[in-house]
Amino acid sequence: MNQVNNVVNFNLVANVTKFLYRSLYLILAAALASAAPAHAQERPAPAPAPAPAPAPAPAPAPKNAQPVTPQPDGSHLVPEGVKESTPAPVENGSSDNNAAPVPEGSSLPEPAPRPALVDTSINPNPPFTPGSMQSLEMEHEGKTRRYLLRIPNHYSPEKAAPVLFGFGGWGDSPENYSSYARMQTTEANNEAIIVYPEGFERAWEAAPYAKTRDGEDIRFIKRILDSVDKDYHVDRNRVYAMGMSNGGGFTSVLGCHSQDTFAAVAMVSGAFYNPVEVNCADAPMNTLIMHGVNDKMMTYEGGDRHEAGYLPVRTVLGGYLKRNRCDMTFQSTPEAGGSERLSFNGCQKDVQLVKVPQDHTWFWQPDTPNVVWDFLSSKTRV
């Protein structure tokens, strides 16, 4: 009986010992496996996914124009630092502040007229008669473009005629703009070849809704001028531009980039979106700005419209004052309808601002077509 118990005890001890050895082996094997490099493992753990590369920062969008806060004294209506000056009285009725005194009993000589630039390509038999207006088309950079051409009542191949370009607002047809511009009430009707171009899809460059870019519209206008010059006696020294709203903004683009072509520009209720003042040529330009201080569409103080910023009037004016090297002072004179005209001093070329107590429109008071033509027609390029 004792022998049987001894055998049982021996077998039990052997089994326990065998179990302990096997457990110790498995523990050591697991420890070694976890310490082995990944390539030595049977099923290597997947490498951790790399951290996603940070997305590139978007290019900064052009800063929207910062609206100007209206001031009770009206100082927000002119560029910062510009002040009204009181000219010293000048004898003999001269309006030139810098003129030398004229001896008593003598008079100022009449200034010599500037000669018109010679036009050697005059057609003695132009295609359209004086007083007529035609709708014309041309292919330009893959687009069919249209414009109205009006020949002045007093046109003669023997006398060089000024050229006036007129640009309507967004959505305006040339016919519509030529109607409300009322240039037939001015001497331009008798003197000037008037061109009313149509914007592509009735919009002009620099506005966010325009379909033209990178000077396409500027080149279109210069092609029209060259075409007109082939058939008519054009005074290249007296080429002018005027515009309303979006057309006023584009007129400012011409005033900023085409001083080699235009003698003077006039902007009425201009839509001065930010690109209007980008990369302007540093050259003077005779400039008239007329804007309603109560304009609710393109506010005088600047703001945002069509998800784009537009400039305060005083910022656009300030650009012309700088390029004309004005001395940042002005004289103020009253105009019809409670308007005020600011004429700036010391400029290489004439710069004027007419502040009108009205909304976004081509004004009746003051009489916009005559104010515009009286200003433009007195200017020459050289």
State where each predicted segment sits:
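Active-site nucleophile loop of the alpha/beta-hydrolase fold
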Residues: 199, 266-273, 292-295
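A domain-start/cap signature at the N-terminus of enzymes
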Residues: 40-51, 55-163, 242, 246-264, ...
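Acidic catalytic loop of the alpha/beta-hydrolase fold
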Residues: 295-298, 361-362
